[in-house]
Amino acid sequence: MHLHFTPRQIVEKLDQYIIGQKDAKKAVAVALRNRYRRSKLPEDLRDEIAPKNILMIGPTGVGKTEVARRMAKLVGAPFIKVEATKFTEVGYVGRDVESMVRDLVETSVRIVKEEMMVKVKDKAEEQANQRLVEILVPSPQKQTGFKNPLEMLFGGNQNVNQTSESQDDTEIQKKRQEVEKQLAAGLLEEEIVSIEVTEQQSSMFDMLQGTGMEQMGMNFQDALGSFMPKKTKKRKLSVKEARKVLTNEEAQRLIDMDEVTQEAVYRAEQLGIIFIDEIDKIAGKQSNSVDVSREGVQRDILPIVEGANVATKYGSVKTDYILFVAAGAFHMSKPSDLIPELQGRFPIRVELTKLSVDDFVKILIEPDNALVKQYAALLATEGIEIEFSDEAIRKIAEIAYQVNQDTDNIGARRLHTIMEKLLEDLSFEASEITLEKVTITPQYVEEKLATIAKNKDVSQFIL
């Protein structure tokens, strides 16, 4: 966990991936820092301080989800993104709102389990290598055939058999020592071995996913699982691949799942972040239709955000200190259309601004995962170095901005469609052409995109 970052450091880290939206970055940075501050308080005071949930308002593609996702990744906190439209009111078929908490705990368990497996990796690899040695040099099968009754009575050949077995054991030990050295030197990596691994059983309760009954299915499956033995199956793998599989198995044996569960539930309760997207789609007063009541979904979300105990397969989880970040474009509705109780549970309001041409230019070149860098890396695998002139970058940004203005505004996602169309021919021919370097100029951009961008009817379908 990295809760020690200052708000300024958090904003600087987010700047590496997200352009603009300073207000949103500041809001999440303060929310994260307050968690660190809360952890330093005396226990009685700590219990009184709940996180201040955030409501992000802004059009699609401006970075709402990315801000929350990068924030969670930065501190290693359990994070899930859910869509408000996927939930249904209690009593209807569909996912109930408590499933978001169960998903958060599952994510937390996975994170903690991976961390603990890393800690025991060296020991697990050592045990996996030992198993590989035993597979490569197996113990001889002991003779269990019919014994002469006279030999059993007088023990005629007993000493001879014992001597023979001890000689075999000595030879096997020598062979295993040699194989150990070869394994350590990496000489047997491509050798094919047959190993027994625990079979991953597909659950008959998978069909319950998305029906709101998955928790019942999990509990029933766990009850059955304790009675049914685990199946194993044989797999033929190279030593290199077998080591990975066996190391994973040994690591899972070495970690204490009770400890994992305890830590995971604690992290979910104290550090968890739930991002509720499209909350504007359940806002509004029109609840008298044949559709599932949107207001009913809001009322179901309310107790989770306020603080409740949710039953999960890992035990009861308190939602009092989980940070909720809700987001919506609010094109057809406004935040005041949410029920008053839910509005009050999101005291921090952040409005994200529409992206300008300058923002598009920065998005194309500045972030660590910038689109221009991604396409350059992809084409470099074909031996082609691609370079964009500053004027070409500007031209791409202007076209993206203009198409957003003329059609639906989908924010930075427009750049993906623009770049795909721009480099479509080059990507198709890259494996066949002999050019070592290609420079993208404004004229090239104009040739590939301008005609389409100017024709509003065409750009709606292509860009």
From Swiss-Prot:
Binding site for ATP: I19, G61, V62, G63, K64, T65, E66, D277, E341, R413
Species assigned in the record: Bacillus cytotoxicus (strain DSM 22905 / CIP 110041 / 391-98 / NVH 391-98)
Pfam families found in the cross-reference section: AAA, AAA_2, ClpB_D2-small
UniProt xrefs under CDD domains: RecA-like_HslU (cd19498)
Keyword Nucleotide-binding: yes
Name by which UniProt lists this protein: ATP-dependent protease ATPase subunit HslU
Quaternary organization: A double ring-shaped homohexamer of HslV is capped on each side by a ring-shaped HslU homohexamer. The assembly of the HslU/HslV complex is dependent on binding of ATP.
GO cellular component terms listed in the entry, alphabetical order: HslUV protease complex
Family annotation (Gene3D superfamilies): 1.10.8.60, P-loop containing nucleotide triphosphate hydrolases (3.40.50.300)
SUPFAM superfamilies listed in its UniProt record: P-loop containing nucleoside triphosphate hydrolases
SMART domains, alphabetized: AAA (SM00382), ClpB_D2-small (SM01086)
Keywords: ATP-binding, Chaperone, Cytoplasm, Nucleotide-binding, Stress response
GO molecular function term, any single one: proteasome-activating activity
Example GO biological process: proteolysis involved in protein catabolic process
Its job: ATPase subunit of a proteasome-like degradation complex; this subunit has chaperone activity. The binding of ATP and its subsequent hydrolysis by HslU are essential for unfolding of protein substrates subsequently hydrolyzed by HslV. HslU recognizes the N-terminal part of its protein substrates and unfolds these before they are guided to HslV for hydrolysis.
HAMAP family: HslU
Family recorded in the similarity comment: Belongs to the ClpX chaperone family. HslU subfamily.
Localisation per UniProt entry: Cytoplasm
